[in-house]
Amino acid sequence: MENIKNHPAPDQLDSFDKYPPYYGQDLELAYTPQRSVFTLWAPTASKTRLNIYSSGEGGNPEEQLEMEPSDDGTWRIAVERDLNGSFYTFQIEKEGKWLAETPGILAKAVGINGDRAAVIDWNQTNPEGWESDRAPELKMYSDIILYELHHRDFSIAPDSGIRNKGKFLALTETGTKTPEGQASGLDHLKELGVTHIHILPSFDYGTVDETRLADKTYNWGYDPKNYNVPEGSYSTDPANPVTRIREFKEMVKSLHRNGMRVVLDVVYNHTASVDRSNFNLTVPGYFYRQNADGSYSDASGCGNETASEREMVRHYIVES
């Protein structure tokens, strides 16, 4: 580990352009059964810590571990045991104050409501045949027949004939019909000759409380929370980090098998919130465009907009 004196002092980073970029592939978790290495890019933090939990919600952390700084704007710690099935958050201290916990900005698996990141065995997320799955060949752009859909809207009707209503798995069911005998769901898309499915946001967003799905809270998903994790309300078990990923993959595999390519709508230009966003809880201010008076720019019309002109924001979007 680098000595703390080599870490860029927060008070020296008076311009976003001075924040040291980090392009390593180990952000934010590198897992093996033998050890997990956590690496957080937080160049303005004075301290950071890792909180390890046994569950995705509630309770106190089983461990709180101080992370060690490096001279590239990152903080690191290695845990020398198998953490599969555990959950974790990061926290940073800035200007003498510990900010709220965050799963980080690059979490790929989370617990319910996306508040804690999860350590999982990625092999468990692969449905049978996933390794050989390929999108259907596209020969000419003029052949495209595009169909846009929202996961919940597409299958939620009581008379849709679909068992997994409002879920990723709805797009894996065949032989479904309406009471009038018309094809529904996936069979309806095939009837139309659709070649491409454009799916409204599929990734973890903030509006729907995944512990209260009976409330039928609705949103299109344009309020992103965790960009790299499938939305839990579209899973049959939002509390299980593996389930939401495996079911998302099953959906993609099913669409490919039925001759359709998948286009994913991802909302990179703004986030659901600002002050409690994972971006601002990790590197405060950096990921958002601001006006001259320090207020947040709002060209998105959603209260904030991400600063894609900054190096690590661009890098984040490309890598995500």
Where are these regions (language model features)?
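The feature marks proteins involved in alpha-glucan
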Residues: M1-P33, P69-G175
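Structural beta-strand segments of beta-rich domains
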Residues: Q34-F38
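Beta-strand cores of secreted/periplasmic/IMS beta-sandwich domains, seen most often
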Residues: T39-L40, T195
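Short proline/glycine-enriched turn/loop motifs at strand-loop junctions of beta-rich domains
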Residues: W41-T48, L83
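Beta-strand signatures of extracellular beta-sandwich domains
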Residues: R49-N51, Q91
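Solvent-exposed serine/threonine-rich low-complexity stretches and specific carbohydrate-binding patches
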Residues: P61-S70
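Substrate-binding/active-site clefts of carbohydrate-active enzymes
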Residues: R152-S320
